[in-house]
Amino acid sequence: MAKITKTFQYGKHTVTLETGEVARQASGAVIVKMDDTVLLVTVVAAKTAREGQDFFPLTVDYQEKFYAGGRIPGSFFKREGRATEKETLISRLIDRPIRPLFPEDYKNEVQIIAMVMSLDPEIDGDIPAMIGASAALSLAGIPFKGPIGAAKVGYNDGQYILNPTVSELKKSQLELVVAGTANAVLMVESEAALLSEEVMLGAVIFGHREMQKVIQVIDSLTAEAGTEPSDWVPPAKNDALVIALKEVIGGRLSDAFHIREKLQRRDAIAAVKDDVIQQLAGRLEVEGWNLAELLKEFGELEYRTMRDALLDTKVRIDGRSLEAVRPITVKVGVLPRVHGSGLFTRGETQAIVVTTLGTARDGQVIDAVTGEYKENFLFHYNFPPYSVGECGRFGVQKRREIGHGRLARRGVLAVMPSLDEFPYTIRVVSEITESNGSSSMASVCGSSLALMDAGVPVKAPVAGIAMGLVKEGERFVVLSDILGDEDHLGDMDFKVAGTSEGVSALQMDIKIEGITEEIMRQALQQAKVGRLHILGEMDKALAAPRAELSDYAPRLLTIKIHPDKIRDVIGKGGSTIQAITKDTGTQIDIQDDGTIVIASVNNAAAREAKRRIEQITSDVEPGRIYEGKVAKIMDFGAFVTILPGKDGLVHVSQISSERVERVGDKLKEGDVVRVKVLEVDKQGRIRLSIKAVEEEVASI
């Protein structure tokens, strides 16, 4: 295939798609250029599915090459290693809108690799990667119901910004990524500075409208490339098996979905499934049916039973109305020795969240393609297998945990104090101890409580809620505070976090087309009502940050010195600073601009360290009387230390009003004496006098 190039303007940026020259053995390959950011995105699809494959094995890997930014990796091996958190998040960002566009029965392995090969510091690789994945899939000749478009939306001064630069995002009140087909929004990921629901919805609509240009260009690219449509044919539906299943199941699935407790409901459905397998085991061999086919059709009946009951009765699995939030219990200060903690329980979803305060040196150093930087607000989300009553691997962080942790972090970021306001490194850890839907939003609520319990001056409490949707034709219901089954069997997962004033984070994943603006508006308004209810419940436990930090949290004292005096505080070979930290038990951080932060759990120790630093850095004042220690005896006088690192000379003539023959007759090394500063000359030499102090005292 000859090289094909398509170029178009996308916001302020020029985007180019190229295919036919590089990676020609892949099923589909595209080079995407957005100004100076360049990615190679490839798709390889297996010709057939593995035997017995019962899920769609789609993998997406996004990688930023260090050479893209003109850097060599800082690791020991000097090469790219396992995926960073950013790479994992962008891999998920690519995956989420494309996965629903493959047929349910398609089980062939598909791998997407997006490599950033040149990186403009002002243009991140996420949007080009999503565009490239869409184009490469469209060229691959597989049953992909795309293409999709993707756009990033900023918001400043009442105006939406299409694909803002990194610099523009720093000033923006919004960072929102939206992806979808020509007719439908499929995915939204965002963080916001407490914006209204209308502004958030407007950003989604704006982004979807602008991305139409991307979809048109990809359609043009695939048409010119002459991509043959996929010859994959879905397996024929086994009507006889479906009839047999329905006869054996009867009304038992419907009865199981009336059980309100999750584990009992799960066990009841499993019992029905086991009985069905046992009853139909003989017919499987006779009719030529296979077990995988039976289990698939059983799952389809599960799906249909729950959805039909919900649409017909407007009553949910656990007996709630559509808008009702599950019962909430809130506790704070649940762990005695930590700096802040909260226990948030909503129905059968529960999180213990802990806040730890540290100093600036506890921040995480990130070795990124664009250079090193330090992260001082860390949020970690853990989802152990026991939280859903299962056995499984423990301690290995999965992509889902990274994604949920980042969403929860976005939820509280808008209310966090700046480093100038609260100069601590803050780590929040959410331990999910029970899960039946919306554990990431429980983490938002729990983190808000733990932060306030730790005394972090957040601007306002934050709560989060997950919304769902069940839609059949023109009939639909929007669900507040969804259960795990409602998420799994529903058409939308719509998470909203924020304060009473506005939205701080919005995440949406939609499995179907036909989600209208009106449905999204209803979901946002219903989420607001639920969020305010949850905030009210949280306020009963703790409505504002505690006035005092935990007794076990470090206290920080900050002082500012002239940068020229930093070397005095450090001392030769670090001797001075080491002595202070050892004597006082404090931790001291010195910045290049002269800012010194002293950290200690003991207030008195921190104050002593501060006093000693102020002594070292203070200037000697002529005319002032100091108490000093005799450091050295000379024939012509004595050197007296009046401040750390500052010695002055008391000439023999200034030791006493009487004549002094030998200095040693009056002074000895180690003597503590009071001296007056007579002069500090241009070379910084200090002249002192004991005699002047005696005369001054005598004159009073």
UniProtKB/Swiss-Prot annotation:
Residue ranges occupied by any S1 motif domain in the UniProt entry: 623-691
GO annotations of cellular component type: cytosol
Main location: cytoplasm
UniProt cofactor(s): Mg(2+)
Positions of Mg(2+) binding: D487, D493
Segments forming domain KH: 554-613
GO process annotations (BP): mRNA catabolic process; RNA processing
Pfam families: KH_1, PNPase, RNase_PH, RNase_PH_C, S1
Similarity comment: Belongs to the polyribonucleotide nucleotidyltransferase family.
Protein's name in the database: Polyribonucleotide nucleotidyltransferase
